[in-house]
Amino acid sequence: MKNRAALFAASLLAFATSSHAAPAELKIATWNLEWFMTPETLRALTPACTPADAPRIGARRSVPCDVAQGLARSREDIAALKRHARALGADVIALQEVDGPEAARLVFPDHEFCFSGRIAVQNNGFAIRRGVPFLCGPELTDLSLNDDVRRGVELRLFPGTAKEMRLLSVHLKSGCARDSLESTRASCGELARQLPVLERWIDAQAADHKPFAVLGDFNRDLRREPAGLSIWTEIDDADPPDADLVNTADGKAFQNCMNSQTFSGYIDYIILSRQMARGLVRDSFGRELFPPKDAQRRKMSDHCPVFIRLRVADAVGVAG
């Protein structure tokens, strides 16, 4: 709770001390950093790591033993991630699987942060380049199913101005990438329970007539969902009217982050409201692939960033 209050105070300071001038264009990205925490945190948690066959116990401050043994990142690994963040050059990045601001700062030293306050080491949040006015919005705690999975984190850019836009960082339940949400699998049931929470947030922004985006790790191929109940058909129902959505990955070829990967479709997405999509720079959707040498030698992540560019004035429907 103290950490969350500090983040909110920092966002107020960032808003108060900024020039409030919106840049003409923003580069927005999402990146799951795969169990990213400071080396000191990982060392402290390793002795009491959780075995693979241990029963699942909600949110707690622990790491799986395979993570403790296989994802201990060296200074060189962290430096490679930092280089990749610099190459990405995004103004706003939705982050997943990051312990919090202290860890995120190792990769994004020139950014401010909004993060969820979940006790577990996997948190959602945002990195915001210094100088971009923002406020940390409320956490979407209901999305976590009583903190069994990850919370949503809201970010408000250019708050209190005609150019205000709202972003939600999500990391939905894994284990139901292509199955029906009506499947009897427990993971599909949990994902289905998250769906109305997400839809309520979308509908609330639409009813408030604010441009908005949902971005992050959906743990699901939204472009190839099976028939029946699905994430996309539920959230993209244009009810209310401003809840009509655009998947920025539509029509784009899939790329793996490195040669050793064999995935066949995106699960990381940037979803825009129809209003915000009016500012989408044509052909700006992309994926920042890992350099081959870093992919081979360094412990990067099983995800690499997905990004877009937005013309701010068009995205919010006001004159520049």
Identify the meaning behind each predicted range.
Residues L33-M37, V98-E102, R118-Q122, V132-F134, ...:
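Solvent-exposed loop/turn segments at secondary-structure junctions
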Residues I28-L33, V63-L71, L81-A104, L155, ...:
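Active-site beta-strand/loop signature of hydrolases that rely on acidic residues for catalysis
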Residues R200-A213, N219-G320:
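Metal-dependent phosphoester-hydrolase catalytic domains
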Residues D77-L81, A94, G100-A103, N123, ...:
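Stable alpha-helical elements in mature extracytoplasmic
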Residues S169-S187:
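Active-site His/acidic residue clusters
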Residues F8-A16:
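Bacterial N-terminal signal peptides
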Residues V92, E97-K173:
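Structured beta-strand-rich core segments of catalytic domains in phosphoester-bond hydrolases
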Residues S19-V107, I119, D294, R311-A319:
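N-terminal, active-site-proximal structural segment of metallo-dependent hydrolase catalytic domains
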